[in-house]
Amino acid sequence: MVGHLVKYGKHRTRRSYASIKEVLDVPNLIEIQTASYQWFLNDGIKEMFGDIMPIDDFQGTLSLEYVDYQLMEPKYNIDEAREHDANYSAPLHVTLRLTNHETGEIKSQDVFFGDFPLMTEQGTFIINGAERVIVSQLVRSPGIYYNQTTDKNGRPHFGTTVIPNRGAWLEYETDAKGIANVRIDRTRKLLMTELVRALGFGSDSDIIDIFSDQYDALNMTLEKDVHKDMSDSRVEEALKDVYERLRPGEPKTADSSRALLVARFFDPKRYDLASVGRYKINKKLSLKTRLLNQTLAETLADPDSGEIIAEKGTLVDKEVISKLTPYLDREDFKTTTYTPSGDAVLEEPVTLQKIKIESPENPEKTLLLIGNGHIDEDDRTVRPADILAGMNYFLNLQEGVGHVDDIDHLGNRRIRSVGELLQNQFRIGLTRMERVVRERMSIQDANTVTPQQLINIRPVVAAVKEFFGSSQLSQFMDQTNPLGEMNHKRRLSALGPGGLTRDRAGVEVRDVHYTHYGRIDPIETPEGPNIGLINSLATYGRINKYGFVETPYRRVDWTTHKVTDKIDYLTADEEDNYIVAQANSPLNEDGSFVHNTVMARFGEENIETPIDRIDYMDVSPKQVVSVGTAAIPFLENDDSNRALMGANMQRQAVPLLDPHSPLVGTGIEYKAAHDSGVAMIARASGEVEYVDGRQIRVRREDGQLDTYELMKFRRSNGGKNYNQKPIVHVGEHIEADEVLADGPSMEQGELALGQNPLIAFMTWQGYNFEDAIVLNERLVREDVYTSIHIEEYDSEARDTKLGPEEMTREIPNTGEDQLKDLDADGIIRVGAEVHDGDILVGKVTPKGVTELSAEERLLHAIFGEKAREVRDTSLRVPHGGGGVVQNVRIYTPENGDELAPGVNMMVRVYIAQKRKIQVGDKMAGRHGNKGTVSVVVPEEDMPYMPDGTPIDILLSPMGVPSRMNIGQVLELHLGFAAKKLGIHVASPVFDGASDDEIEMALREAGLPQDGKSVVYDGRTGEAFDKRVGVGVMHYMKLAHMVDDKIHARSIGPYSLVTQQPLGGKAQFGGQRFGEMEVWALEAYGAAYTLQEILTYKSDDVAGRVKVYESIIKGEPIPRPGVPESFRVLVKELQALGLDMQVLDGAGDEVELRQMDEDDSILPVDALEKLARTNPDLLNKDDEEVAAAFSKVEEQSQTFEEK
């Protein structure tokens, strides 16, 4: 036997073909959600109140400070919140302290700050009773970015952007003449030197003193920057110029300009780099990284001892940098302090760190490297030192020193997870509240006011509510199956507020970048307009405190060159400095490399390199891909496009009645199911005392009893059936974190999205043409692919102007047969079988004494009775919604339920449908091999194997070669061997079974080595000419079921303006006969067909009613009238002032129907209802029917005369 046995959980053992030793377990897969929210509760709230408070009033007498906060007990628990359509949230109480500086009085008070949504253990929120997920957002990181463009003459232009987390952008750029300009917040250009002068370095000599005179761009800019107004100092003139750019047309003074610049860049409330922005700027401008590979133009010595560290002319390599690093970190090494003039924006001195280097393009020329000194990590605004050092980097870039940034590099894109997104929203609410507090401080009496009276929590509550309810990133959770659920929580979206938009995103942003390796899955992304903008976190990826994605690597010892088990998590820009060997590099037992050279990655290059240069090694072959992709066996043999479809379609698999985990898995099935949140996990170890379908009781080792309530037939967000089944038995000892009960799409603790049928690749009567699938009837009969779907329907009884609506069994014009399953209140009983159009909740609405509609006139004409003054507004089963009533919930204010204003009672009915697989359903394997069922063949007619076993599914062999997803064929063969041997196997991605191993498994199972078999025709018993590939493959039924899509319209709603039928299943619409279809009929000269399609069947309002009448009366169909859309066109032209008339063949004007003539035409639905409510009418002879109609016509005539 090749391979080794691995236990997954307690109940499943697989033969694993993995050859690479895993040194690191897959981390908790939904930690991205839970850890981020935990950070928000622990630190995020404090940080935010710290930013906003203390709030001082305008006079400075009152000051409101934040002390502490606490979350109270939630009002509803998770299940109650679901049931009551409420939020799972806890009241937030904040302790505030109000200080009166005049009297010295201090008041502390606990202020209620609204209900705050809590995250469930599964990483979701329950908002209005529905589970929602906050998707993490991928955005540009704050920091300083350099770019280069080439103009049409081939000259390079450089640009710099300083991007804060919030606040004004600062941009430097060179123009066509090579002069350096600055833009503040996307306004008009300003010379770069003017900004330096505004910072307090007024004279040309000051500027040259800082930057040196070796830069052409700077010298040209200084030439252009002349002193215009001699009455102002250079600093004041520069300040006024800046002000004019920012506020054009306003009177400019140096003071207002100073205040404006301070507010724009140096006020922490207006400008915030966030800790990540400060980190990125310090990293970009620090001399440690910038000195690498440059040649020194001065000798560097120890400031204390005078000992020489590096001689002039030394090329700075990694070794020299490691010697220099401790000195560069010192406050007194090569630093110069400049003091700005007294009339500058900021008066504090500026400390810069400067080192001279040779220009790479001209060694005679000496350039300066200016670092931003030692700015504290906690300083969240941009400092003058940043601005000057940033300008120096910009000038050096034009001399060939430094490098431009790649905006799509994951070192420059960061993740905003739940915690941060929530914090940003909360901060917006607090900022709005701050304004209110300031106003109230100045209005109210300072001696009597309390914190409670100052605070208005409305803006805060509104901001949080809006975020959870309607933000683009707060999404209704995909609950088709556990994999879809987990994938949704690990999704990374570049869309949303502060992100990209679909139309503006180019190809570069969407493309796979080399830094995605181990961080973002290159495969799993939607097809369509969002491709590449929505991604999935890789299996081992995690997010660090700055929001950058890190991936783990095994450290390689630099002296022994052996791979250790020490794990380092690296961000994308750290990884750029190292050479990383691939996970499949062969190792000896002691961790040394087998070969002297290995394939490795360095930056974006794949290189073959000697082992003494290797710094790190991949942790696992599956670290490249996400969990969904890692569940595809033989992924390495599939084309990437098909792998993408396979990964996406696994999320759409419907939970089946009795699912089976794949015979050929990848070994991640257990972890995926365990972390998805649908399995029941043991909280502590102990012994099982009691098990049934509803609960499991476990006696802990310390004697406590844990009770686990199982989820039973709950409707998921996607209308699927979520159900849990115990997999432990009484007396069994269990460990903490073990799976006690399977959720939907699980078996024995593993993910089980489909079944393992016997599949053959062969054609059958052309029925599997173009990806169609031929099924064995056994799959229908034995409920192999049967799923349960639950739909919910609501009916509300409201107060109307004419009186309250009433839930009742007394419904006008309904027979007893329709009421047989309703109780006294008109509510359906649980367990009743209902069909389309059946009443679920009987409800009547009072009718005002209005003029009779044509419908009622018709009823009067036939029955001559006064109709009751109520209308039937019962809740009925919609088309395709029939099934068994599974549950009924009644909500009334008397029971303490919170209902919307004006609602007296609400009834919610759940209908369960059992759907067997049928023609038209979509099915798929895990390799993007999808198809629709075209025919279900009796078992005895299906082709069968030599031992008499009929094949379950026939797939077309044409679907394999052109699509290059060969993984399905390998899975088929290995699955056949596994089935015969009665084992489960694991073939992990990029480390799975080889061809030889599959052949050995087939031989072990006593099967032919090529995996093919003779197959006999079930109808004739003859063998087919050629041997056929037969085997076992994991095959799923997808959520695209024909029941949800099939649709037919007889009579339905019409659009108000054009009077044409609406479109779409949801509106019970018709089929659009478009322009091209009209051409087709015209081409065949089918004039009458075309005419009726354009008139009676569409928008000839009078005509379609007359057709209905003539059909009922059995008369010939009258000639069509003028279509409504034509009338609309005429009216539009008349509205434009064109005199438009319609003439007939004789030249007489055709009268078009007037707007107010609608009443005189009987609505078709009135007639339909008449026929429905009085079926006996249709059985009477024509004369009686005709009489009824003529009576109606008379009535409408008299009505018109009135």
From Swiss-Prot:
The kind of enzyme this is, by top-level EC class, is transferase
List the molecular function annotations (GO) for this entry: DNA binding; DNA-directed RNA polymerase activity; ribonucleoside binding
Query: Per the UniProt record, which EC number(s) apply here?
Result: 2.7.7.6
Check the record and name the CDD domains matching this protein.
RNA_pol_B_RPB2
The record's InterPro entries line, in alphabetical order, gives: DNA-dir_RNA_pol_bsu_ext_1_sf, DNA-dir_RNA_pol_bsu_external_1, DNA-dir_RNA_pol_su2, DNA-dir_RNAP_su2_dom, DNA-dir_RNAP_su2_hyb_sf, RNA_pol_bsu_bac, RNA_pol_bsu_CS, RNA_pol_bsu_protrusion
Q: Which reaction does it catalyse?
A: RNA(n) + a ribonucleoside 5'-triphosphate = RNA(n+1) + diphosphate
Any Gene Ontology biological process: DNA-templated transcription
Describe its assembly.
The RNAP catalytic core consists of 2 alpha, 1 beta, 1 beta' and 1 omega subunit. When a sigma factor is associated with the core the holoenzyme is formed, which can initiate transcription.
- Family membership, please give it: Belongs to the RNA polymerase beta chain family.
User: What is this protein's function per UniProt?
Assistant: DNA-dependent RNA polymerase catalyzes the transcription of DNA into RNA using the four ribonucleoside triphosphates as substrates.
* NCBIfam families found in the cross-reference section: PRK00405.1, rpoB
The identity of this protein, by name, is DNA-directed RNA polymerase subunit beta
Q: Which organism is it from?
A: Leuconostoc mesenteroides subsp. mesenteroides (strain ATCC 8293 / DSM 20343 / BCRC 11652 / CCM 1803 / JCM 6124 / NCDO 523 / NBRC 100496 / NCIMB 8023 / NCTC 12954 / NRRL B-1118 / 37Y)
Q: What is the lineage of its organism?
A: Bacteria, Bacillati, Bacillota, Bacilli, Lactobacillales
